[in-house]
Amino acid sequence: MKANDIKKGNVVEYNGGIYQIRDIERSSPQGRGGNVRFRFIMYSVPGGVKTDASFDADDNLPEVELLRRQSTFSYKDGEAFVFMDDEDFTPYTLDADVIGTDAGYITDGLTGIYVQVIDDQPVAVQLPQTVTLEVVETPPELKGGTATKRPKPAKLNTGMEIMVPEYITNGERVLVNTTTGEFAGRAD
């Protein structure tokens, strides 16, 4: 696939690795004959390591077929995470090192997960934008402290720690943004 045909979300092969395109910048310099250049911000699949590369419009990058299968987290098998396909109930097993820091967002029965599959092999997961987690440990609210909006640390049921507003108490369910790792509101 030529560089000028690539769109955000495409998966390509580059330098022996597989990458998903997340951002594209197009530039047409005036000084050297008007050759259009494309700068791709791409992340490795699996792993999510960011790479920045520039290409001419005619450069060829082989496209890779990536399937996104909607799944539910089923259980943990030792250090591996097992996800169940929502349509055909195919189990997908991914090692903890592939899941990485996203493990702190995964709870029993979590839905809305997309398992990314290349050649029938699961290679990565894409989590929902927000997940609901329970606060298991946080300091109590200070009396009269509602005039200022001071965040305080809170330990969640997955072992993750985030900063929450002072009014959040132990046992409350909160929404956490999986992209930033920040408090996103109270859960219903």
UniProtKB/Swiss-Prot annotation:
PROSITE patterns (alphabetical): EFP (PS01275)
GO BP annotations, alphabetical order: peptide biosynthetic process
Alphabetized GO MF terms: translation elongation factor activity
SMART domains: EFP, Elong-fact-P_C
Disulfide pattern: none
Any one cellular-component term (Gene Ontology): cytoplasm
CDD domains recorded: S1_EF-P_repeat_1 (cd04470), S1_EF-P_repeat_2 (cd05794)
HAMAP family reported for this sequence: EFP
Recorded family membership: Belongs to the elongation factor P family.
NCBIfam families, per database record: PRK00529.1, PRK04542.1, yeiP
Full protein name: Elongation factor P-like protein
Originating organism: Xanthomonas euvesicatoria pv. vesicatoria (strain 85-10)
